[in-house]
Amino acid sequence: MEIKLNKYIDHTLLKPEATKQDIINLCNQAIQYDFATVCVNTCWTSFCKELLKNSNVGITNVVGFPLGACLTEVKVFEVKKAIENGCDEIDMVLNIGALKDKDYDLVLNDMKEVKKAANDHVVKVILENCLLTREEIIKACELAVEAGLEFVKTSTGFNKSGANIEDIKLMSKVVKNKAQVKAAGGVRTYDDAIAMINAGASRLGTSGSVEIMLKQENKSNY
């Protein structure tokens, strides 16, 4: 049975030079394909809310993005403003330096405070796997589960590399049924998307969403 990819996809536009017209195009595409969410920076939340008001498409906002190095209080403020402006899901970046320092209390508290501010909204934590060792990825996943987060996510897409199959399998194994896995960064093709899902991802962050859907439609027509 063919996987319906559209509801796996957070249709993503996070580049700093994004214009209003770019965001309009993003939202129109999301409506056309009925994607799970659009993933945008918080300055666009209200604008997207209006554009998407008659659709089933949600809004994901990034927080502490892309470095994760701001104060927890700043992340909490971002979350509260994002939700106030209409966002549905939060993708936060964890404090990577603190994880490497083994300051697990700080990392855990950072995630817990964001989740507390988000309340019943879905929170995904971005690990930025390309900067982490295997052991650090495992520990970050364990802390995310302890913090009560719904997803662990591979990458911001702003660093040296993004999602890979080995990391998705590892993250899925660690979180088991206690959280889900989002693959992001470098998920550009239909084959990438299917491979990530087969490895254990239940959400995909990609700016190549339309190309992926067109490829699926072409396959369905044969």
Curated annotation (Swiss-Prot):
Cellular component GO terms, alphabetical = cytoplasm
Q: Locate the active site.
A: 91, 153, 182
Q: Which InterPro entries did the record assign?
A: Aldolase_TIM (IPR013785), DeoC (IPR011343), DeoC/FbaB/LacD_aldolase (IPR002915), DeoC_typeI (IPR028581)
Q: Which is an annotated Pfam family here?
A: DeoC
Which GO molecular function terms does the record list?
deoxyribose-phosphate aldolase activity
UniProt pathway: Carbohydrate degradation; 2-deoxy-D-ribose 1-phosphate degradation; D-glyceraldehyde 3-phosphate and acetaldehyde from 2-deoxy-alpha-D-ribose 1-phosphate: step 2/2
Family statement drawn from the similarity comment of this UniProt entry: Belongs to the DeoC/FbaB aldolase family. DeoC type 1 subfamily.
Q: What is this protein called?
A: Deoxyribose-phosphate aldolase
Species source reads Mycoplasma capricolum subsp. capricolum (strain California kid / ATCC 27343 / NCTC 10154)
